[in-house]
Design a protein with these regions (language model features):
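Conserved catalytic core of nucleotide polymerization and phosphodiester-bond processing enzymes
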Residues: 1-170
Length: 170
C-alpha cells in the first residue's frame, strides 16, 4: 500500500493515516523509499518537467494525457496536474497493455475455436466465462497473452484463478 501511495504522491500525513502509524514513521518510510529507489524520484521529477514543457505526458504506446493546469499559479490545481503527470504514463501504459492482451486473447480464441468468452475487464484484470473442458487451454492462452502483450526490461507477470464467482476466483 505504501509503494503505490508514494509513487502517486501521498503526503506524510496521508501515509500516516492510511497505515495508522505516527507521522515521523511515515516520513521515514517515504524518505527511505526514495533513498532505496532514487530512480523513482528522478522519474517523478522528469515527468513533471516534461509536462511543464510540453503540456502533456505520454504512455509507452504514445497516447497523450494533456495537462492544461500543469503551470497553474494555484498550488492545489498545479499539484493535481503534477500527480497526473506522474500517474498517467504508468496507469495509461497499463491500460494500453491490457487492451493489447485482450485483442490477442480474442484473436487466439477465435483462431482456435475456443467457445469460452471474455466478459469483463477491471483495471489489470480480465474475467472470463469458461467452459469446463476448455479450462486449461483458456488459462494457458490468457497467461501467455497477458505476459507477452508488451516487451519491457522487466517481465510482465500474470496469475489466474477460477471460481463460480469473482470472490472465489481470487
Amino acid at each position: 500500500r505504501a509503494n503505490f501511495g508514494i509513487i502517486y504522491g501521498i503526503t506524510v500525513f496521508g501515509l500516516a493515516e492510511r497505515l495508522d502509524i505516527p507521522r515521523d514513521e511515515a516520513k521515514m518510510l517515504i524518505d527511505g523509499y526514495f533513498e532505496t529507489f532514487p530512480q523513482v524520484h528522478d522519474y517523478m521529477e522528469k515527468s513533471k518537467e516534461i509536462a511543464r514543457q510540453k503540456g502533456y505526458v505520454t504512455t509507452l504506446f504514445g497516447r497523450r494525457r494533456y495537462l492544461p493546469d500543469i503551470n497553474s499559479a494555484n498550488a492545489t490545481v498545479r499539484g493535481f496536474a503534477e500527480r497526473n503527470a506522474i500517474n498517467a504514463p504508468i496507469q495509461g501504459t497499463a491500460a494500453d497493455i491490457i487492451k493489447v492482451a485482450m485483442i490477442h486473447i480474442f484473436n487466439r480464441f477465435k483462431a482456435e475455436g475456443i467457445k469460452s468468452k471474455m466478459i469483463l475487464q477491471v483495471h489489470d484484470e480480465l474475467n472470463f466465462s469458461v467452459l469446463p473442458e476448455e479450462k486449461e487451454r483458456v488459462e494457458q492462452i490468457v497467461l501467455e497473452e497477458m505476459q507477452q502483450a508488451f516487451q519491457m526490461k522487466v517481465p510482465l507477470v500474470a496469475d489466474s484463478g477460477f471460481g463460480t464467482n469473482w470472490l472465489e476466483a481470487h
